[in-house]
Regions:
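Long, contiguous internal "core" modules enriched in hydrophobic/ aromatic residues
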Residues: 4-10, 21-26, 81-83, 121, ...
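Short, structured segments at the rim of ligand-binding sites
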Residues: 126-130
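Perimembrane loop-to-helix junctions flanking transmembrane segments
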Residues: 41-53, 122, 268-271
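Membrane helical hairpin/interfacial module
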Residues: 50-117, 131, 135
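Class II aminoacyl-tRNA synthetase catalytic cores and aaRS-like
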Residues: 8-20, 30-39, 80-88
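Membrane-interface helix-loop junction between the first two transmembrane segments
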Residues: 33-49, 75-81, 217
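Alpha-helical transmembrane segments of multi-pass membrane proteins
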Residues: 20-41, 104-110, 173-180
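Peri-membrane helix termini and adjoining interfacial loops of integral membrane proteins
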Residues: 38-43, 114-118, 258-266
């Protein structure tokens, strides 16, 4: 299957409007960073009960979505779905962008910028989060190599092998990210090995959703039709991923209900948690 890639010219008013919008979002983000650094992490919702605040919600979402954004590239090279090959480079590029965004948000935890050097030179190998640093950097390296084999014609015959390594590594990355929460034995809301497969299932759905939004925007802005058949295939895949995520959520809560020590937490999150219960049923389950 011969694929001809054409770059977007980036000369239309809409393109510059998009750049301006993204620049505005970046400025708002920098303003939020300054506000948090000035007033402390308490403004993000963190306290003795809530171990991570709102920035961490976005960071974990971006990291998990980065793994799922590689879905299309994996289907093209690992599973032999040739119809997805023209869309594979965007998949890899978006995966890198999402991971970089998530890790940038996590940098806020370090406080002063110079503490990054300490984090890079001193590792606590008993910490699952420290081990995840290697998973994140490895994922970046594998995806860059994967993109190179796709974009360089003389390296195309290595694409299936590079895709396989990237696929295995993304599974390890999402498992490690879920284990950050699953190994928090002091927190009843987490403390479950089921969080690892749950994160994998959710990453497939989140990543594909973000990828589709970017793909549809790019194709619409550049006048390139996607086709109803391709969109229908993506819709079926998304339905399967959502069903898998819902399955693991149900199993997770049923497992907690089996153990008496988790009953208070389950009563809180499922019935008596106020806004948290509403967010769970309407946000996570219904939506």
């Amino acid at each position: 299957m011969k694929i001809t890639l054409r770059e977007l010219q980036g000369t239309s008013p809409g393109y510059y409007l998009l750049l301006a919008g993204l620049a505005l979002i970046a400025l708002l983000g920098l303003g939020a960073v300054w506000f948090m650094e000035h007033h402390g992490h308490i403004v993000t919702g963190m306290n003795n009960q809530i171990v991570w605040g709102l920035p961490h919600v976005f960071a974990v979402f971006l990291v998990v979505a980065a793994s799922g954004a590689l879905n299309v590239a994996s289907m093209a090279s690992v599973f032999g779905k040739t119809e997805f090959k023209p869309l594979a480079p965007l998949s890899g590029l978006l995966a890198i962008a999402l991971l970089l965004g998530g890790l940038t948000v996590l940098m806020l935890d370090l406080g002063r910028p110079d503490r990054l050097i300490v984090a890079m030179t001193h590792f606590n190998f008993k910490s699952i989060f420290a081990l995840n640093i290697f998973l994140y950097s490895g994922f970046m390296g594998f995806v860059v190599a994967y993109l190179w084999t796709m974009m360089e014609r003389r390296m195309n015959h290595y694409t299936p092998l590079a895709g396989l390594f990237a696929f295995i590594w993304r599974m390890a990355l999402t498992t490690g990210t879920g284990s950050i929460f699953g190994f928090l034995v002091a927190r009843q809301a987490y403390d479950s090995a089921l969080l690892a497969p749950l994160f994998i299932a959710l990453s497939l759905s989140y990543g594909l959703a973000v990828y589709l939004l970017v793909l549809m925007l790019a194709c619409h802005a550049s006048g390139r039709p996607l086709g109803d058949a391709l969109l229908a295939r993506f819709a079926r895949l998304q339905a399967i991923f959502i069903a898998a995520g819902l399955y693991f959520v149900i199993v997770y809560h049923l497992t907690n209900l089996y153990f008496t020590k988790h009953h208070d937490f389950e009563r809180f999150i499922l019935l008596e948690g106020g806004v948290h219960t509403t967010l769970f049923w309407l946000g996570q389950v219904a939506l």
